[in-house]
Amino acid sequence: MLYFVNFGMPDHKSGIEHAELKRLQLFEDHQLPCKIIARDWNRTLHMTANAAGVDDDHLLGMFDYYQHTEKVVSKHLTVADLDFGLQNLTTQDESEKHRYIVKRKNGAMVARVNYDDQHGRQVISTEMFDGYGNLYCVNFYDSRGFKSLIQWYSPDNKIDNEEWVTPDGKTVIRDYYKKDVHGKLTKTGWWLSDHQGIIHQFATIDRLFEFFLNQVNGEGGNIFILDRSLLADDALTRLKKPAYTVMHLHNSQAGDAQNPLHSILNNNYEYALNNINKYSAIVSATQRQTDDVIARFHPTSKTFTIPVGIVPDKVLQAPRITEAKRTFGKVVAVARVAPEKRLDHLVRAINEVHKQVPEVTLDIYGYYDPTNKYEAKRKVEDLTKKYHLEGIVNLKGYTNDVASVYNDAQIFGLTSVMEGFDLAIMEAISHGVVGVTYDVNYGPNDIIQDGKNGYVVDFNDWHAIADRMLELFKNPQLMQKMSDGAYESANRYSPDSVWQNWNKLLTDAKQTLKGSEK
């Protein structure tokens, strides 16, 4: 079995989740058994995974595993289905707060029932109160309609411990909160009752997850692809039975991606890189990154270059949209609105372009990173006001329909500090969008081939970004030529092409695991 290790499958996905989904589809197409492992508990895990095309057969949640809820028939649970063990209760709807208030006949509160307006008022949680009006516990319900997590509260209204239960109410996992030396409430331990009823205790969720991975690995012979390094970078080096372990680099291994051989390490990969030879293989998305990893760390583990992006055949074979049918002047960026994306650089470039091409617009699609009180979003908004670009620069938020965005755009702009591949710019060229990017490691400076499907300009030179955009907007023939080049260059990421790269790794895994049996 192949396992892709992650924390979950959220509704708003990062490039890592999108890469997993593409890989899952590719492996399914080649009849390979595979599952996404989700370490963290989330009441909507199955709902969001199913919506993304991951059925329950291809999803393995750690909490599901112990709660016996890997496959459960869904039930639409509403307030009418709840039993509070009392009679003569009244229910008041506070629709503006998305909840019901449940009271005794004398007006004393029994519970607050929080519901999901987007899914027929399905119950999310119940906040339970004692006879003195004190909150004593909160019950969280899985989106499939059963109680899954109970949070117990202390007299000072803090979470004291949490329990995860089976659908029939048996507690199988607990965690505990205690005050540290500074008086701060801290999670101090985990308790597990495994499938045989044996009790185990762990100091951290990392140790619990390590135990779980060893149980999943069983007698060995499995392949684990670690997509979120910090979740199991050490655990995968301590599996008790043979397995083929893959450290997948989804971002720059260096803190300064432009100085990969000498800068401090990206803290997300620090442990893994310092223990690089404890993994069976290392995967990078570009040859440039693979070469840099080899040059700095000299691994004896196998290294493979495998693009994380896959362009479906139906996209490669779709009718091409000419520049004449696109909105003239439309520039797009599809990325988290986060500090490392430096979208303010792109706004500065658009301001320069607008002086000569008044039709230009910049539409930014992506969810807003809350770091430093949404600093990146505020920078874009502040520059938009400073340059009087209201209605020209537009923050559009997250979208699930990027195809429509790309099919109407002429240019994709990218000004990041670093990337691990950048699925968005790969998807953009597959729709004929011309890329204009900084010479940034890793991905954009490989996906965009300077002079063929766009332009790669000097790092940090937003003036050059503006100049290249102006060159394209002022020369329709050049824009069309570059768009044609974009369509053609996307064939590098066809399913067949990417599969050939994965097949090399899988062949090595088969040989390695066969050797471990001797």
Residue positions per predicted region:
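A short, active-site helix/loop in glycosyltransferases that binds the activated sugar's phosphate group
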Residues: N275-T303
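A short, well-ordered alpha-helix in the C-terminal region of glycosyltransferases
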Residues: V405, A464, L478-R492, N501-K504
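Nucleotide-activated donor-binding/catalytic signature segment of Leloir-type glycosyltransferases, i.e.
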Residues: K377-G397
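Short hydrophobic beta-strand element within catalytic cores of glycosyltransferases
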Residues: V434-Y438
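Conserved donor-binding/catalytic core segment of Leloir-type glycosyltransferases
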Residues: T322-K341, V347-I350
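Acidic anion/phosphate-binding donor-loop and adjacent secondary structure
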Residues: A257-P260, G309-F328
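Conserved acidic donor-binding segment of nucleotide-sugar-dependent glycosyltransferases
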Residues: Q449-G451, Y455-W462, L470-Q477, N491
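Aromatic "clamp/platform" in nucleotide-sugar-dependent glycosyltransferases that forms part
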Residues: Y398, V417
